[in-house]
Amino acid sequence: MSMPRQLLLIVCALVLLSAYAVTSKAQSRNVDALTKANQGTIGLVSGPFGSTALNFASDMAEVLDDFENFETRLVVKLGKGTGQNVADLLYLKGTDIAIVQTDVLDHIRRNKIYRNIDGLLRYVTKLHDKEIHLLVASDIADMSDLSGKRVNLGPQQSGSFITGSLLLGLSGIESDIRLDTDAVALRKLLVGEIDAAIIVDGKPSSLLTNLPTDHGLKLLPIENQFMAEKYKSATFDNADYPSFVQEGETIPTLAVETVLAIYNWRPDNKRYPQAAKFINRFFSKFEELQIGTYHPKWESVDIRAEVEGWERFSAADKWLKDNPIKPDAPEVDPLRQQFEAFLEATQPNSNWTPEQKNLLFEQFRAWQKQNNQ
């Protein structure tokens, strides 16, 4: 082989090696980017547009996302209602947690929607309460007027439908049921196409606060004794909805609890460690959600609260047991501090017993009180 041909082959080989190195480096960068984009991701199904659940999910993402170490990234998805959120949690790929109403379990059991639902779902923590808003046209005086009227309950898998259906059923009211979303129902209510809408959402709901001030609608009180056995008492006041409630007045209603639900991953499942990592970060940074400009309902959330009828996810239970509440430090009596400092300064080598110190201090306190009169 001639020298020029050998040189040509060597040059070609070097070019190919260089191209391979560039390609390998580019592929490596792509793999790194793919890994970073997916590691630590937790899929959270929240609530529909305008809901308190969506606000909560957005707050959580802002506080918990970690783009520096890629340990946690919350991917928030708009939900279609509490029943659909359960379906997404069970079957939708990339969904790890969901915000759902606690009464959804009773609804699923009663209607036999899923087998072994108690073994499939767990909760991480109780979240906010969702109040029942019974919005009506101005000519509706009380709930009995809803018989035969056009009442929107929301889509069949929504929390409003689940809770609203129970409310009407226990009240013995048969209405012309509509299944529009809450936002669509409000628009129809404003123009008279329906007579009422039952919306279950945490107060203050932006669905109501964003209405024009001259909306002409009313919030009816809800005081059903049968519902009160299942749900919590609540009220609306002027601070919640200035255009619905006069200063100094309240409107009674009921509320349903919500939880951060999670699929019951077994500890040996590959998703379990990531779920546990998310829970550790969420609980560790929880106090940040109770301050600042986040939704006001965070202030009432107690991550240690038990939820009747639900079982807590094992990783969440472990974190709470490993991080017990520290007892409040006993209140320090300034006078006692001064007394102890005086004894230490004047009699450093004394052998006072605790009982003798206490007796001497009480005599000193009585003497001081007498001299200050």
Predicted features, each with a name:
Residues E62, V75-N116, L186-K188, P204-L211:
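Pocket-flanking alpha-helical
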Residues G40-V45, S51-I97, G248-T250, L360-Q363:
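Extracytoplasmic small-molecule ligand-binding "clamshell" domains
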Residues S28, Q156-L167, A234-E308:
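Ligand-binding clefts/hinges and TM-proximal coupling segments of bilobed small-molecule sensing domains
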Residues T102, K112, I173-K270:
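Pocket-lining segment of extracytoplasmic ligand-binding domains
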Residues I10-A19:
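Bacterial N-terminal signal peptides
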Residues Q39-F67, T72, K130-R187, V191:
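Bilobed "Venus flytrap"/periplasmic-binding protein-like clamshell domains
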Residues R115-L127, F244-I251:
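A structural signal for short loop-to-beta-strand junctions that line the ligand-binding cleft
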Residues V184, D201-H215, L219, N264, ...:
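An extracytoplasmic/periplasmic, membrane-proximal ligand-sensing/linker region
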